Amino acid sequence: AVAAVSWPEQVFRYPQPYTAIPLWDASGVPVSSAIEDTLSSGGMLNYSSIALSLGEYAAPMGTGAALVLLACGLFLWSQKDAHMTASVSFLATCALIAFFFPRQAGLAESDVLVNALPRLQCVRDELLTGAVLFSAVFLINEPYTCAHHRMGRILYGVLVGAITMGFRYYGVYETGVCFALLTVNSISGWMDRTETHLYA
């Protein structure tokens, strides 16, 4: 979050996949802005689902390969190192907001059932870009900041998802999930204490 605020011109420009990057001097490597620029201006992405799943687009390192991230998430959940409740509620909240309130031009005012397929494409684009899936696997389940009780984890995921989409829709930084996590982490302890008092 600090690097994004301090150096946005350098932080949010990425080399295209399969670009040869020299070991010592990478200043000559052409970089481009992320696909978040297209989404924030109301456009639709021209990438196939396979390209998005494999991470074949300019994105922060490690956040684009959705299949690898899902495999890592399944491994962590099978080893009991991560709880699914916070991640699933986070992704479900992001998906619902993207489906019912899409950023793409003309879709928000259209009938939901008539334009269900373009809305589902918006959900795909929002979940597979902007480090959303990376955050669901690795950042949401941080044991020291995530709520410890089940209902608290669900509420934690919903709040992080709603604030993330708010930052993505109205903010200037594509990885708004970092700021959403910082915001909700400040009340995660309170959520645990409240749930303990309610069920005690």
Where are the predicted features?
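Long hydrophobic alpha-helical segments that form multi-pass transmembrane helix bundles
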Residues: 1-70
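Hydrophobic alpha-helical segments embedded in the membrane of multi-pass proteins
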Residues: 67-70, 87-96, 126-139, 154-162
